[in-house]
Every structure is written in C-alpha cells, then in structure tokens.
A protein has these predicted regions:
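A polyanion-binding, active-site-adjacent surface
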Residues: 2-185, 194-198
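Glycosyltransferases and closely related glycan-assembly transferases
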Residues: 200-204
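Flexible loop residues that form catalytic
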Residues: 191
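Short, flexible loop segments at boundaries between secondary-structure elements
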Residues: 205-210
C-alpha cells in the first residue's frame, strides 16, 4: 500500500471514531471536515503524502475559516486553492451552526494562522510540490467544536471524560502518520500540539519541537 493510501486509511479510521462520539453542553455543534470535506482532504493527502518526510508540522484542530472550510490543515482559502491546487467539492455538515456556515472555497473569511503558516511556506518554497517533498502538515484533532452562540471551543476545554476518549484516537492517528512518513522532526504549532506529540510519540525515536 502506498504512503498516501496509508495516510488516507488512517484519516478515515480517525473520522469514523470521532463520528461515534457525543459531546455535552456547552458544545452544541461539532464539525468533522474529514467527513463533509473528505474529497478535498483526500486530494490534499494525494498531493502531500507521497514521500517520506523530514518534518511534520502539527496543529491542534481545525479553525472555523481554515480546515473547517477547506478540509486542509491550516487551510487558508487562497493557499489551498491557488498554491496547493485543491479543487474538490466540499459539502456541508449535517448540523450546521447558522453563525458558522460552511462555504468551502467560496468562504470570504481568512484563517489568520493559516495565512501566516502557508504564507511562510510559499515564500520559502517555489511550489507546493517542492514543499511537500520533505514536509507535511496535519492536525492532532480533526473536529471543530462550537457553543450555542457560535463561539469556538478548543479541545483543551472539553471535559476530562470527553477529552480522554477523543485524545486516545487522535494520538493513535498521529502515531500512524508519523510511523508512515518517518520524519526526523515533528514541529508543533502551539503548546497543546507539543504536549500531545510528546505523549503520542513517546516510544518513537523522533525530535519534537515547537
């Protein structure tokens, strides 16, 4: 099985595991872009995960105007569409929050962290293909959590019982990604991602930075 097929299979398994979970209030809406934006995420994997890597960049979870819209980690619209070249169809989640509509590549809002990250990569590398030769970007958790008001709720704010179940499957997915791509480094974007990488990859011989 090819590297990209292994990564796709791991993502599908993670998506299925997450879809079986329930989350209590104040969480009222949960988006899983590995579900409704799967064609775009699969296209991303097929372009980005075809070689072993030197570095894997790890984020916490999708932002409302990034991966939630595009299916690509830190997926700022213009970077996903114009630099990476993603053009797959993106549908809507079943329980869409009226204040957080999914507009896909037509979304007019910009993910600030994604604009910075992919902007940095596009300045350093002449093409996305060149970047993906040795680098990959993935989120630890694929889910977006919202409260009744539409406020974003990050995974570190979940109850301990909810977090324990979710973190287990997310850690297992991260382990599979790193085991498959064999990077020298995992670079965490933020303290939460760094903590999860240290836990999930504890028995692998790998460098973890932030």
């Amino acid at each position: 099985m090819s590297l990209s097929n292994n990564i796709s299979k791991a993502a599908r398994n993670l998506s299925s595991a997450c879809n079986s979970m329930d989350f209590a209030k104040p969480v009222t809406h949960v988006y899983n872009p590995l579900d409704y934006a799967w064609p775009a995420h699969k296209q991303y994997i097929e372009r980005a995960a075809i070689t072993k890597k030197k570095v894997v960049f790890l984020g916490m979870n999708p932002g409302p105007f990034g991966m939630a819209q595009t299916g690509v980690p830190f997926g700022e619209i213009s970077a996903v569409r114009d630099w990476i070249g993603i053009d797959a169809p993106i549908t809507k989640p079943e329980n869409e929050h009226p204040k957080r509509p999914i507009e896909g590549l037509n979304c007019q809002r910009s993910e600030v962290s994604g604009r910075r990250l992919w902007g940095l990569f596009s300045k350093r590398f002449e093409s996305a293909e060149n970047f993906f030769t040795n680098h990959y970007v993935v989120n630890h958790c694929p889910l977006v959590f919202m409260e009744e008001t539409g406020k974003n709720r990050t995974p570190d704010k979940l109850s301990s019982s909810e977090a324990e179940t979710l973190m287990k499957v997310c850690d297992e997915h991260l382990y599979k990604v790193v085991e498959t791509l064999e990077p020298n480094w995992v670079i965490a974007v933020g303290t939460f991602a760094e903590k999860r990488a240290m836990i999930a990859l504890d028995n692998l011989d790998i460098n973890i930075g932030k």
